[in-house]
Amino acid sequence: MKSPLAQILQNLHTPARQRLLESQFKKVQTQNVSLEKTLKDKERELDRLKNELNNLEAKIQELNGTDILTKLPNRFVFKEHLSESLKRAIRVGYSLSILLIDIDNLNEINLKYGFELGDTVIIEVAKIVKASVREIDLPARWGGEELVVVLHETDAEGASHVAKRILKNINNLDITDLKDNSAIKVSATIAISSCPQHSSDVSHLIEITSQALLSAKEAGGNQVITAKC
């Protein structure tokens, strides 16, 4: 037994039938466009919620003062610590140095092997940095592929010895991609600045260290560099 719609279509002349089919087709097209728009709106809303969640996690991380990945103090804690330490160094009259450590090939590792392995590299480098400094010093996660260290009672020459030791251990890291058992080569660039040799201001000290780091990376990276006075 034919459906009512099929019966109507059979009884219609060809032009009328064609118009009806076109009308139904346009209606379906309109519905599809509406569904696609709704889907895109939902995707945008999902992206917005993800961004809000990431921002919230960053705020929580900042308030806690600890970097989730490395378990080191975060940038917020580092800057507060550096500010207070500089005041004390100036008042007491001792040297203080900072190291800015950038993992040279982290972006390449992320693209080639995935972000999970990239996170492993960051964690292992953080372990090396922490193991290479004293209890009185402060290693921290600056963000992305960068770590920082406050070295108390240490001038630029002493900081250079620490930095070279850290770099050597980073170069000797034994990390393997489990998918194809290939060895992952890790390198880093480390910049040094000191108070009072280079500056006694937090922002200026960080700025000149960043500039030195950039110069070293442009020269090929995988080296230790001291900021210019």
Regions picked out by a protein language model, each given a short descriptive name:
Residues 1-12:
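Non-catalytic regulatory/interaction regions at protein termini and inter-domain linkers
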Residues 24, 28-69, 76-87, 137-140, ...:
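Signal-transducing coiled-coil linker helices
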Residues 61-80, 101-114, 123:
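Conserved nucleotide-binding and Mg2+-coordinating catalytic segments in signaling enzymes
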Residues 110-118, 143-144, 220-221:
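A short glycine-centered flexible hinge/capping loop motif at secondary-structure junctions
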Residues 124-197, 226:
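GGDEF/GGEEF active-site signature
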Residues 160, 164, 193-229:
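Catalytic-core segments of nucleotide cyclases and related cyclic-nucleotide turnover enzymes
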